[in-house]
Amino acid sequence: MEFSPAFETGVLVQRYKRFLTDITLDNGEQVTIHCPNTGSMKNCLFPGEKVWFSTSDNPKRKYSRTWELAQTPEGHIIGINTGRANALAEEAIHAGVITELQGYHSLRREVKYGSENSRIDILLEDTKKPNCYIEVKSCTLLEEGQGYFPDAVTARGQKHLRELMEMVEQGQRAVLLFVVQHSGIKSVQAATHIDAEYAELLSKAYHKGVEIIAYSTDSSPLGASLVKSCPVRL
């Protein structure tokens, strides 16, 4: 995925009201930009560190700039825009990077499914095999060298696990794909200390046949892509 034009830089001041972030531009001006991340962003907020943002030419937007990347004090890069995770996953499937998800003749996004009125992030279909339902989650929480998901209690994430288990029970294939958007994360596991119910459901889903995989992202101001499999600790 290429970013055109390339992201511009600033320095983080603060994130507040969930969707707003103040940064200082390279010319010293302080501006408010959109934060496209609904999570707690635990361990992603480092005031005084470098950030990168994109700029939209849509005149209807109140905030034309969107926060895209953050740099940690250790020099790691974090993908802040969780909305890019699905596109990164789709691109990686088409490119053959995600080897577990090859051999299907069609790919669709945001398809309604399940008994809890959900939309699956990616649906792979083929006439010769069961459909493959893929739920994509962006993972950015790093604590003591370990990557965790979620970074806050997620009722929505719990619902998605129940829906995936339902698909397996119906004879379909179900996959939970963690898109790792923190360059310091080397493996992923459930954040039992943050959302014990999610962790319990994740273990249950795995034992019922839901496949759980993770892929690391290589991100820069010029572009991003999924590059390699990342271990999941269950």
UniProtKB/Swiss-Prot annotation:
**What intrachain disulfides are recorded?**
none
Q: Which Pfam families match?
A: SfsA (PF03749), SfsA_N (PF17746)
In alphabetical order, the GO MF annotations are: DNA binding
Q: Which CDD domains match?
A: SfsA-like_bacterial
Q: Which InterPro entries match?
A: SfsA (IPR005224), SfsA_C (IPR040452), SfsA_N (IPR041465)
Its family remark reads: Belongs to the SfsA family.
Q: Which PANTHER family match?
A: SUGAR FERMENTATION STIMULATION PROTEIN A
Q: What is this protein called?
A: Sugar fermentation stimulation protein homolog
The gene name on file is sfsA
